[in-house]
Amino acid sequence: DMNEVGVINEIARGESIYAARFVGKYVYFITYRQTDPLFVADISNPTAPKLLGELEVSGFSEYLHMWDDTHVLGIGYGDSQQSKIKLTMFDVSDPTKPVEVNQKLIDSSESWSNEFVYNYKAILADPEKNLIGFTANDYYLFSYDSENGFSLLEQQALTYKNTEGYRGIYKDNDCLLYTSPSPRRILS
């Protein structure tokens, strides 16, 4: 049995949490319904969590990943119609004032087939190798730097339009797109 030990009231009333990431004494979370804020809360005292900051952004993230000590990567949608995939980088160096420092929108005339919206294992997010990969009709592989933002390294057409089961993995210096029965090299 789980017991509630602390609560933060009166935030994002009527909205749903779409993504959350717990890192040390902080939790970062995204809600969605009318507005799409990123919230930062201090959970160092579990019985008295405190909301520290929030930032309203367009779109919403389905996945959050701590990129480095001061940045959180978000992957989701750039609009409420879910017609654009959005990569976003948040600067959370000041938890009371999170800032969206970069974003990249991917548009498609087709509806999206994205396993990452319900399976976080479908995302390759590796700050050390500077790789961000996921399926969204095709397999996309990006890098990130603070000056240039997100850079598309590779867009690989998928053999099957059902994106389930495709994984970006790396071995040594090769990035592979893996699916049964055999992997394909997409970046060396």
Tell where the protein language model's regions lie, with residue ranges.
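Blade-edge beta-strand/turn elements of extracellular beta-propeller
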Residues: E4-V7, P46-E54, T96-K104, S109, ...
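Conserved blade-ending motifs and adjacent loop-strand segments that build the rim/top face
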Residues: E56-E62, N102-Y120, L152-I169
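Structural motif
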Residues: T35-F39, Q82-T88, D138-F142, S188
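Loop/turn-rich, solvent-exposed surfaces of beta-rich toroidal or solenoidal domains
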Residues: G74, K84, E115-D145
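Short loop/turn segments immediately following beta-strands, especially the blade-tip
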Residues: I43-P46, F90-K97, F142-F150
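Short beta-strand elements that form the blades of beta-propeller/WD-repeat-like
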Residues: K25-T31, H71-Y77, N130-A136, G168-I169, ...
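Single conserved hydrophobic/aromatic residue that forms the stacking wall/gate
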Residues: Y178-S188
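Structural signature of eukaryotic scaffold interfaces centered on beta-propeller domains
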Residues: A19-R21, H65-M66, V117-E128, G168-K171
